[in-house]
């Protein structure tokens, strides 16, 4: 009888085999179902994520485009604002320069007014008077100083506002430059796609950078810069109008004062010429009267000498008749007549001597008054010359410098002319 040469392996039951086959089949179906479910979910997920990514990329591309449009609109607004601001800065600078030129132009009227006051300091004696001309000249100096003060204030305001506009311009430039950089970055982002060579994963790209701002803060910042620039440009326009008005008003005030001063000068010159003519007429009449009086004195002296000769004759006759002898020494009619003649001659001579003394006193008085008249004529001549020089000097205010030719000799002028203490005191009092 034959025997097995190997040990038999463990045997499974048929039911176990069938169960195992069933389980394998069932598990295979379940795994296939699960795999199918996973495949379907993966497909759905892939489709959904693909769609989501497409829409997200489309939305963000749209947002980028809209953001670029928004930033570009603000950039264009800032462009216009900067252009307007540059134009306003130039206009205000021109207005400031015009005010500075007008301020510089006030030096000539001031110099002329001070020169006229200085010239009139050379008046002499009674002509050193506080007349309307001096009052107008002092008023002119006061008006010029006031106009210079007004213009200087406007120049200072323009300078300060120019500094403010420059500061605003720098702020706008900075904002404009930032927006240009932003547009460049966002346009670069908008141009990127899946095939772009320079795309890559970044380290923590979702981080919030330091000093980030909200959209509201961003909008308010740019709007504030724009509104501030517009407000300051409006203020600059008002300042330019105020500068133009100040220039016009100061020029009108100065021109009106110049006309008033020159009218007073002409009136004073006519008055002075009238007094001068009157004095010359008085001098002529006084000289004629002196000549006539001197002639009368000579005739009085000649008559007095003749009367003395007549007196000598009468004295000699009376003295000679005292030498008659004896009874011939008679007091006859001849003696009485000679005595009467002597008395009459002595009275006449005394009267004539008194009249001669009165005439000589009158002549002395005429000579003294003539000296006063001639001294006053010299003063008036000097004053007329000085006022004529002043009028000639004032022609510089209406005649261009290149065409100005002095009509009379004038004093050498200095740049920094100062008033006398008397004039300074008068200016302070006014």
UniProtKB/Swiss-Prot annotation:
Q: In which tissues is it expressed?
A: Expressed in the testes (at protein level).
Q: Which GO terms describe its biological process?
A: flagellated sperm motility; inner dynein arm assembly
Q: Which residues cross the membrane?
A: none
Q: Name one GO cellular component term.
A: microtubule organizing center
Is this entry keyworded Coiled coil?
Answer: yes
Q: Which InterPro entries match?
A: Tektin-like, Tektins
Q: Name the source's superkingdom.
A: Eukaryota
Q: How is it modified after translation?
A: Ubiquitinated, leading to its degradation. Deubiquitinated by USP16, promoting its stability.
Q: Which residues form a coiled coil?
A: 75-162, 226-380
Keyword annotations from UniProtKB, A to Z: Cell projection, Cilium, Cilium biogenesis/degradation, Coiled coil, Cytoplasm, Cytoskeleton, Flagellum, Microtubule, Phosphoprotein, Ubl conjugation
Q: Where in the cell is it found?
A: Cytoplasm, Cytoskeleton, Cilium axoneme; Cytoplasm, Cytoskeleton, Flagellum axoneme; Cytoplasm, Cytoskeleton, Microtubule organizing center
Question: Is Coiled coil one of the keywords?
Answer: yes
The primary site where this protein sits is cytoplasm
A Pfam entry, by short name: Tektin
Similarity comment text for this entry = Belongs to the tektin family.
Q: What does this protein do?
A: Microtubule inner protein (MIP) part of the dynein-decorated doublet microtubules (DMTs) in cilia and flagellar axoneme. Plays a key role in the assembly or attachment of the inner dynein arm to microtubules in sperm flagella and tracheal cilia. Forms filamentous polymers in the walls of ciliary and flagellar microtubules.
| Self-association state and partner proteins as the record states | Microtubule inner protein component of sperm flagellar doublet microtubules. May interact with CCDC172.
Name it: Tektin-2
Instruction: Say which species the protein is native to.
Output: Mus musculus (Mouse)
Its gene name is Tekt2
